[in-house]
Amino acid sequence: METANPLVSPAASTSRYGACLLFAANALARAVTVIGDAEFAKLGLSYSHAYLLNEVAEQPGQTPTALSETLFLSPSTITRLIEKLEGKGLVRRQPEGKRTLVFATDAGQVLAPAVATAWQENWAKFANSLGEEEAIQLTRQIIAAAEKFSAAE
């Protein structure tokens, strides 16, 4: 049985797919990624690399599994991000028994404040486009939805 989408309305969007959650989520992701990538590119990082670096700088010794859960990324993606950051000399892995722990190097710790500044610059651009309150509410709704979808997997 097909479920009708109550959001379907010619005025709802300029796209005929504007009532599709998958389409809307990807359109939003592309739009904010353009903003985020531009800011983090100044540091030679993608936004995913920047978030991972920030995590291990703020909370040293996390496992790749914990990073995967925190950043909503697959374990294989986390491994690729760690490898790239290792190549840049920004993080290091340390075996501990059967686990592997990830730490920011001294160079990673030095770069972490610039990552935080880029993060703030991105937020300012998002809030300027949407309005502060709408940006806060949208962020909360997106994270809540991501957590629900992750729990359902």
Where are these regions (language model features)?
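N-terminal leader segment of winged-helix/HTH proteins
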Residues: 1-43, 101-103, 110
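C-terminal regulatory/oligomerization modules of transcriptional regulators
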Residues: 1-15, 117, 132-153
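Short alpha-helical elements of helix-turn-helix
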Residues: 19-23, 43-54, 79
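Alpha-helical linker/hinge and terminal dimerization helices associated
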Residues: 28, 32-35, 39, 71, ...
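Residues within the alpha-helical elements of helix-turn-helix
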Residues: 55, 70
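Central "turn" residue of the DNA-binding helix-turn-helix
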Residues: 60-61, 72
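Helix-turn-helix DNA-binding elements, focusing on the entry/boundary residues of the two helices
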Residues: 64
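Charged, amphipathic alpha-helical coiled-coil/dimerization segments
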Residues: 83-143
